[in-house]
Design a protein with these regions (language model features):
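Sec-dependent signal peptide recognition
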Residues: 3-10
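C-terminal motif of bacterial Sec signal peptides marking the signal peptidase cleavage site
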Residues: 15-18
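Short flexible loop/turn segments that cap and initiate beta-strands
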Residues: 89, 97-132, 224-261, 299-305
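Aromatic sugar-binding surface patches on proteins
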Residues: 134-150, 158, 264-274
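Surface-exposed, short loops/turns at beta-strand junctions within beta-sandwich domains
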Residues: 151-157, 277-282
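Acidic/polar, low-complexity intrinsically disordered N-terminal segments immediately downstream
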Residues: 20-120, 309
């Protein structure tokens, strides 16, 4: 009887261990549509996969920029609304194993290359482009992020293609010169501005104007430098600037607002500052670009600056 009891306890312990192991794999019964969770170390755990899945519900796929690699993997591209527009656009990428649908944690996405064909002149140029895609959130490593800021929209005058290289678990793949449509934004939403310093042309891309509300807001932008040759994506400028901002309300006596701080260069290459918007309506944000010595290199003083963004909140 004692032997039987001991055997029962051993079997119970084994069963409990097996149940706990299974729970570790699927993490208390998490189920995700189209995804099978296994003990594959290349892929996300159930909890990680759920985070990725939830994030992907907030963006939309760009089918023409998705691809298959080596018959085993898929790479999918997304933007916030599944399309592109003038100015700053974020691009997100995930890679999956076809066998399970699960998200691969580590893969590389490089050489993002947007190219415009100017039809009448039969010439080509690129546009400001972010660096190689990288995990934008430490909690969601399987989602890689980069960006493109389009200087022109698609029209009879010209069309856009986009290419990139992918490396997934040692296997190479690419999307090459896929046609994309870049839509024009409504009047008053020209959030990509250019300026010259000597013979060099720079582009200032405003990132987050749709997120602003009354009160204090973080203002974020990127400064890119036109490449030579111009068919090469315009990388972030290595030079350092300071961007003073002066927000005004042209429909309300051109009054300003207090407690704004300049955009200064961050470790990730972006420029960030603070803008304080005291009420709803149209704001014209004049900006003055200064070099490291404080000399004005573009724009002008305060509301006299010829460079500005219009933002309505």
């Amino acid at each position: 009887m004692k032997k039987v009891k001991r055997l029962f306890l051993v079997l119970a312990a084994v069963a409990l261990t097996a149940c706990n192991s299974n729970d570790d794999e699927v993490e208390a019964g998490i189920e995700i549509p189209g995804i099978t969770i296994t003990d594959d170390v290349d892929c996300c755990s159930a909890e990680e996969a759920l985070q990725v899945y939830k994030f992907l519900q907030t963006v939309k796929i760009v089918p023409e920029l998705s691809t298959e690699i080596d018959g085993k993997y898929n790479v999918f591209a997304y933007t916030h609304n599944g399309s592109f527009h003038n100015g700053y656009n974020e691009l997100f990428f995930v890679a999956t194993k076809k066998a399970t649908g699960n998200y691969i944690k580590n893969f590389e996405l490089t050489n993002i290359t947007p190219t415009m064909h100017m039809v009448k002149m039969d010439k080509f140029h690129s546009t400001p482009t972010g660096p190689a895609a990288d995990s934008f959130d430490n909690g969601i490593l399987a989602v890689k992020r980069s960006w493109v800021s389009f200087i022109m929209n698609t029209s009879e005058a010209g069309s856009w293609t986009l290419s990139y290289d992918a490396l997934v678990l040692g296997k190479e793949g690419k999307v090459e010169k896929k046609n994309i449509v870049v839509n024009a934004l409504p009047d008053g939403q020209a959030w990509l501005k250019s300026f010259k310093v000597g013979d060099d042309v720079y582009f200032l891309s405003l990132v987050n104007p749709n997120d602003w509300k009354t009160g204090s807001n973080t203002i974020k932008a990127y400064i890119s430098k036109k490449s030579n040759p111009i068919t090469t994506p315009y990388a972030l400028a290595t030079e350092t600037f300071t961007v003073d901002i002066d927000p005004r309300m042209p429909d309300m006596g051109n009054h300003t607002s207090p407690d704004n701080t300049p955009l200064v260069k961050q470790q990730d290459g972006s420029y960030q500052g603070t803008i304080n918007l005291t009420m709803t309506g149209l704001w014209r944000i004049h900006f003055t670009v200064k070099d490291t010595k404080g000399n004005i290199v573009a724009g002008g003083e305060e509301e006299l600056s010829s460079l500005y963004w219009d933002v309505t909140i």
